[in-house]
Design a protein with these regions (language model features):
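Alpha-helical transmembrane bundles and membrane-interface segments of multipass inner-membrane proteins
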Residues: 1-153
Length: 153
């Protein structure tokens, strides 16, 4: 369990520090071009889930739903993590990344009722939805679990 919380803690720290910097230095809805034609730092808020799912629902309902769902997912991960063999570092790291990312965004939902997003990848006029460190950790962790599943671990 120590490594689960250590890795998750690092992800939470990176996520929250990066968001603090965005909140401090980038006005809401602003953008700074980093790699022309590909990458901006932006300051946007997401009241929904990935791709703004449920963003139009009443704020109280959204907050209760997302906080409850996050706590349920983290509880399931902690339970599953305990069953992963100690030598399976790949899967254990994947669970830790998902946990850290989920808790990083949970902190935003509790504090603000929404999530701070700031990474904007795009090609031409097509922009992927803005995301953050927590989202990246959840995505990488989920992909790692998928690879583990496909490899039969």
């Amino acid at each position: 369990m120590t490594s689960l919380f250590a890795v998750a803690g690092i992800i939470i720290l990176l996520d929250q520090v990066s968001k603090l910097l965005v909140l401090h230095f980038l006005p809401l809805f602003s953008a700074v071009e980093i790699i022309p034609g590909f990458f901006n730092l932006v300051h946007v808020r997401n009241t929904g889930a990935a791709f703004s799912i449920l963003a139009g629902e009443p704020s109280v309902w959204r907050r209760v739903f997302f906080v409850g769902l996050t706590l349920l997912v983290v509880a399931i991960i902690v339970f599953a993590y305990r069953k992963v063999p100690t030598e399976d570092h790949w899967s254990r790291t994947a669970y830790a990344l998902i946990t850290g990312g989920a808790l990083g965004n949970l902190i935003d939902r509790v504090r603000f009722g929404e999530v701070v997003d700031f990474l904007d990848c795009y090609v031409g006029a097509y922009h992927w939805p803005a995301f953050n460190v927590a989202d990246s950790a959840v995505t990488v962790g989920a992909l790692m679990l998928l690879v583990s599943l496909l490899r039969g671990k």
